[in-house]
From Swiss-Prot:
It comes from Cronobacter sakazakii (strain ATCC BAA-894) (Enterobacter sakazakii). This is Large ribosomal subunit protein uL1. One of its GO terms (molecular function) is rRNA binding. Belongs to the universal ribosomal protein uL1 family. Part of the 50S ribosomal subunit. InterPro entries: Ribosom_uL1_bac-type, Ribosomal_uL1, Ribosomal_uL1-like, Ribosomal_uL1/biogenesis, Ribosomal_uL1_3-a/b-sand, Ribosomal_uL1_CS. CDD domains: Ribosomal_L1. It comes from the Bacteria. One of its GO terms (biological process) is regulation of translation. Coiled coil: none annotated.
Amino acid sequence: MAKLTKRMRVIRDKVDATKQYDINEAITLLKELATAKFVESVDVAVNLGIDARKSDQNVRGATVLPHGTGRSVRVAVFTQGPNAEAAKAAGAELVGMEDLAEQIKKGEMNFDVVIASPDAMRVVGQLGQVLGPRGLMPNPKVGTVTPNVAEAVKNAKAGQVRYRNDKNGIIHTTIGKVDFDADKLKENLEALLVALKKAKPSSAKGVYIKKVSLSTTMGAGVAVDQSGLSAAAN
């Protein structure tokens, strides 16, 4: 059996794996246990009452968190003409068409989000094998294929998170940094849950938001009591 590190022993002693914590208590506990030498992210896992094997029950989308994620986001935009100028004005680091595609083919991937106008998809389509595995392929379902690239850039910069359930019907994303005020983390979580409720598939039956857990980058998961979350009400 692997030997527990001091950090893991502290987490094991502090976190009751059988308990659902009030949201404020959960955040306080996460902050107390976040002792890494960097500012850890606060991540959320939301178990949804869906059958992930059925395509019509998969949940995918994006939402802007009211207090952002605390991350600095670099944006690449495939577009041309007036849209290119608008994207630059909105703060995009990289803007182009074939020239940008060539950079990416050479392995130059210094960006976190890729946005494209519809007319640019003929170029972006050639990059599927490069962007797809990294989760960077633009998609209209998450607002990254759009005629209004400037707005999409602003959303990305403002702290937009994209979400997509995994094969077990669980959404994994981030809601901020551990040094955020507790109220800001709670409001970000509420905003995400509201977005997930709006994205509920019509064919999903029963309890939709089954479980909500929070964790930090290096910490253990803490289950959250949904009765303290207005947005989680089914």
